[in-house]
Amino acid sequence: MIVIKIIMNVIPGKHLEMMQTLLSMIEPTAKEAGCISYGIFCDIEDKNHFCLLQEWETREYLDHHIASHRFGILLGTKALLREPLEIQIHTVSHSEGIDAIHGARKKQTKMSPIDRQRNLIE
């Protein structure tokens, strides 16, 4: 799986324009071949900070999306930004769910207080 994270720092007063652009992209992008998920997040402390997270089945699907007109629209929002887009692409080779959380928490509760302290130090 490939995850692309895009951070946007929008010029004050351009928040709604950016939001409309991003919202218009959700449905068509989510329907693209290989798109697992597409989410837009807004910082609760600063409405001018957005994070766009997309998950793709393969790098080929992501590359096809990056070459699309729709992604070009996103790149064209630079006039709305205080600074350039921050883009990170991650290749995920393994992922775990809630069972991993439960397992880790069980493991911690079985440790003695001394072992837990040592574990934090290491």
For the regions a language model picked out, list residue spans one by one:
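Short, flexible segments with low predicted structural confidence
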Residues: 1-2, 16-17, 33-35
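Glycine-rich beta-strand-turn "strand-cap" elements at beta-sheet edges
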Residues: 41-46, 75-122
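Short, well-ordered beta-strand segments in beta-rich or mixed alpha/beta enzyme
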Residues: 2-8, 39-66, 104
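An amphipathic, aromatic/His-enriched active-site/gating alpha helix that lines ligand/cofactor pockets
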Residues: 24, 30-36, 55-89
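Short, surface-exposed ligand-recognition loops at beta-strand->loop->(often short) alpha-helix junctions
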Residues: 9-17
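Short alpha-helical
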Residues: 13, 47, 69
